[in-house]
Amino acid sequence: MSKKDYYDLLEVGRNASIDEIKKAYKKLALKYHPDRNPGNQEAEEKFKEVTAAYEVLSDSEKRAGYDRYGHEGASGGFQGFSSAGDFSDIFNDFFGGGFGGGASRSRAKRSTTGVSGADLRYDLEITLEDAFKGIQAPIHYVTNVKCDTCQGTGGEGAIKPVQCHTCQGSGRIRTQQGFFTIERTCTTCYGEGEIIQNKCKKCGGSGRRRDEVNISVSIPKGIEEGAKVRISGKGEAGTKGGKSGDLYVYVKIIFHKIFARNKADLHCKVPIRMTLAVLGGEIDIQSIDGAKIKVKVPEGTQTGTKLRCREKGMPYMNSHARGDLYVQVIVETLNPKNLTKKQIELLKALEEEENASVQQQSEGFFSKVKKK
């Protein structure tokens, strides 16, 4: 470290009081502290210099020696990185324990509690018929599973890791600069607090490996689009004995050519003959469960009319009840190209009858108007 004048470093005069020295140091320490200037070597060097200056000038004996003999007279000067001294108390007075806290805090052993694995998502496509009856759906996916060789310990022969000797299991290294405590990640165990001496060859010490998982998922009847099914413990494997995450299966129902769904109700469109719409009758349709049902068509049914079939829709979740089926009739117009000569003659006769009826109604209407 360069031998710069301590008073110049703290930007105070030689007759400065201890309070002035403390105030000056506080300002400069905050300005150049490594936590506020990560990766800035120049700021870190400056911080060391002002800390060394304060360590001498804040002590009456060291200051007297420095004033008489210079740097050589400042016995017990700045020691670089050393154990925490009484300066931690001054640090707490200044900053309330900020910047990683003072050295007075005990070095706790890093928690060895396992880390839970991540939850996973799986998108499953099923048919409307599958949703109606419920199914057991086989699925497969690739994820991190617990290594079966080391049983998740990461060590060869399932030997558990040992405590890091450098950080004593805390995963952090604390060093003292003046009365500032600087805490960094342990470079021996990389913050883990423990070391695997002989890593498992199969998983490389991670305790997990990539593998394909094949399971069967129970999809309940009546399940709706976008619903999710949770399978506990089938997500990503945890580490250090942590539990596995969960698997969430999201259901997507494939478009159906006949039925449209609205919650538990089903809707479909059925073409009917013009004569059936006029005279009424019955039509046979096939429901979602494959059963044939008869639907009554009232006389004079117009195109677009919806006919309700009670409890012929989808089942409700966790219930024996079912929704309804709505049949929308589409009255087909007759195509002359597909009619026989006799059918055309009958239609013409019907047209003449209708025209005569309309004519009589019109004459009756206008005669009433004239009388008025």
UniProtKB/Swiss-Prot annotation:
Pfam families documented for this protein: DnaJ (PF00226), DnaJ_C (PF01556), DnaJ_CXXCXGXG (PF00684)
GO biological process terms on file: chaperone cofactor-dependent protein refolding; DNA replication; protein refolding; response to heat
CDD domains: DnaJ, DnaJ_C, DnaJ_zf
Domain J: residue ranges: 5-70
Zinc finger (CR-type) boundaries: 134-212
Binding of Zn(2+) 2, residues: 164, 167, 186, 189
Transmembrane segments annotated in the record for this chain: none
A cellular-component GO term for this protein: cytoplasm
CXXCXGXG motif repeats: 147-154, 164-171, 186-193, 200-207
SUPFAM superfamilies: Chaperone J-domain, DnaJ/Hsp40 cysteine-rich domain, HSP40/DnaJ peptide-binding domain
GO molecular function: ATP binding; heat shock protein binding; unfolded protein binding; zinc ion binding
UniProt keyword terms in alphabetical order: Chaperone, Cytoplasm, DNA replication, Metal-binding, Repeat, Stress response, Zinc, Zinc-finger
Cofactor field: Zn(2+)
Subcellular location: Cytoplasm
Domain of life, source organism: Bacteria
Cofactor: binding comment: Binds 2 Zn(2+) ions per monomer.
Record note on quaternary structure: Homodimer.
The record's note on its domains: The J domain is necessary and sufficient to stimulate DnaK ATPase activity. Zinc center 1 plays an important role in the autonomous, DnaK-independent chaperone activity of DnaJ. Zinc center 2 is essential for interaction with DnaK and for DnaJ activity.
Function recorded in the entry: Participates actively in the response to hyperosmotic and heat shock by preventing the aggregation of stress-denatured proteins and by disaggregating proteins, also in an autonomous, DnaK-independent fashion. Unfolded proteins bind initially to DnaJ; upon interaction with the DnaJ-bound protein, DnaK hydrolyzes its bound ATP, resulting in the formation of a stable complex. GrpE releases ADP from DnaK; ATP binding to DnaK triggers the release of the substrate protein, thus completing the reaction cycle.
Family: Belongs to the DnaJ family.
Annotated protein name in UniProt: Chaperone protein DnaJ
